[in-house]
């Protein structure tokens, strides 16, 4: 099959095509979009001012500095350290890796894993998890969720997985794990020598103190988990492309 003969299979692209076709056929209809997690307000003034200052600095001979540190600027890493420390979670600066967004990290981190690994993915969830692994040829197993289990899948000892995806709060259901529930997943991962890829993009919306905002609030998680987060939601940053990944030193 030629590449030009292939049809788009990314969920959001398919939905966009259907929405465009519907709008063309029904221009009088107003569509409420509950798909991609975009924001509805402009960038905060402090963000815009900081960007202006950075561009101005780079436009001077004295201020131009070219490429930044490959793992991210220390001032941003230190701010992330402080953000986690405010919730009682300690991170080392060299455990934090700044990137161009969580979506990129979710794909790039898979370069650390073999293509014959088995991947456990909750259903429903952010479709990128499946797309990235199918592209690499990995086997996908689904952890089914429903209203009966609060849309929160729990470990099944009869299932063996090497890579475990957890999104909490979940996209799209909004369901979030307690620390006790996440401890069950940590124990399962350690038992199976698996790695949890924890998507914390929506952690800032958690207000219930019984719910974990980081998997590193759970004992043992530093030995089996990688946490990926985005500024898109906490800072209204969609389209600006900035996020980070936390890889603990204990993870082998």
State each model region's role:
Residues 1-5:
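Conserved small/polar residues in nucleotide/adenosyl-binding loops
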Residues 6-100, 108:
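N-terminal small-domain helix-loop-helix segment of the aminotransferase-like
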Residues 32-34, 120, 141, 197, ...:
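Hydrophobic/aromatic beta-strand patches that form the interior of the parallel beta-sheet core
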Residues 40-44, 172-175, 204-205, 236-237:
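Short catalytic/ligand-binding loop motif for oxyanion handling, primarily in non-cytosolic enzymes
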Residues 62-189, 203-218, 222, 226:
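Conserved core of the PLP fold type I
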Residues 168, 196-197:
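Residue-level marker for buried hydrophobic side chains located in beta-strands
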Residues 200:
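Walker B catalytic acidic pair
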Residues 211, 217-252:
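Active-site PLP attachment segment
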């Amino acid at each position: 099959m030629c590449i030009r003969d292939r049809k788009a299979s990314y969920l959001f692209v398919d939905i966009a095509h259907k929405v465009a076709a519907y709008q063309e056929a029904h221009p009088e209809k107003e569509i409420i979009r509950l798909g991609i997690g975009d924001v509805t307000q402009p960038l905060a003034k402090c963000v815009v001012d900081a960007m202006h200052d950075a561009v101005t600095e780079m436009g001077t001979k004295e201020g131009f500095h070219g490429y930044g540190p490959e793992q991210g600027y220390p001032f941003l890493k230190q701010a992330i350290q402080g953000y986690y420390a405010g919730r009682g979670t300690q991170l080392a600066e060299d455990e934090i890796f700044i990137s161009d967004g969580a979506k990129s990290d979710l794909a790039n981190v898979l370069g650390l894993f073999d293509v014959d690994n088995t991947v456990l993915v909750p259903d429903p969830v952010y479709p990128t998890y499946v797309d990235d692994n199918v592209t690499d040829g990995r086997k996908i197993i689904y952890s089914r969720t429903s209203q009966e289990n609060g849309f929160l899948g729990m470990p099944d000892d009869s299932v063996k997985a090497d890579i475990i995806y957890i999104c909490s709060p979940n996209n799209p259901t909004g369901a979030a794990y307690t620390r006790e529930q996440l401890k069950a997943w940590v124990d399962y991962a350690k038992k199976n020598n698996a790695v949890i890829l924890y998507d914390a993009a929506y952690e800032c919306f958690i207000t219930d103190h019984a719910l974990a905002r980081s998997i590193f609030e759970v004992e043992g998680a530093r030995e089996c988990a990688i946490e990926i987060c985005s500024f898109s939601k906490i800072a209204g940053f969609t389209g600006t492309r900035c996020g980070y990944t936390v890889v603990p030193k204990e993870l082998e």
